[in-house]
UniProtKB/Swiss-Prot annotation:
It comes from the Bacteria. It comes from Caldicellulosiruptor saccharolyticus (strain ATCC 43494 / DSM 8903 / Tp8T 6331). Disulfide bonds: none annotated. Pfam families: Com_YlbF. This is UPF0342 protein Csac_0863. InterPro entries: Com_YlbF, YheA/YmcA-like_dom_sf.
Length: 120
């Protein structure tokens, strides 16, 4: 029987070789080279995190909060480098979530890990 950690490293290496990861890495490097773009992305992510923290703390997230974040996204994503970064990041996050879900289902932890989220 193979060691699960060895298999996890194989999965990590496969992920690093995937087109999705390479696309994300290239987009990230482009953003990091431009201080203005980097700051725009950081400001957006900060606002996004504040909204998520508000939601997790049970505070009301108003339609105005959501609209403000959507407007900011629309503005910054007019820049093709930022749009590429955000969309490639979203795709990579989806892959990681899918992998986590596949593993949870395979070891019968789906209800424990995802059941609470689905019941809300």
């Amino acid at each position: 029987m193979r060691n699960v950690y060895d298999i996890a490293y194989e999965l990590a290496n496969a992920l690093k070789e995937s087109n999705e990861f390479k696309r994300f890495k290239a987009a990230k490097e482009k953003i990091e080279k431009d201080e203005k773009l980097k700051q725009m992305v950081m400001d957006f992510k900060k606002k996004q995190l504040e909204l998520e923290q508000k939601r997790l703390q049970g505070q009301e997230v108003t339609s105005s909060d959501v609209y403000s974040l959507q407007q900011l996204y629309q503005i910054i994503s007019l820049n093709p480098d930022i749009e590429e970064y955000l969309s490639s990041e979203m795709m990579l996050a989806k892959i990681l979530a899918d992998i986590s879900k596949i593993i949870a289902e395979a070891v019968d932890l789906k209800d424990e890990m995802f059941g609470l989220l689905e019941s809300k």
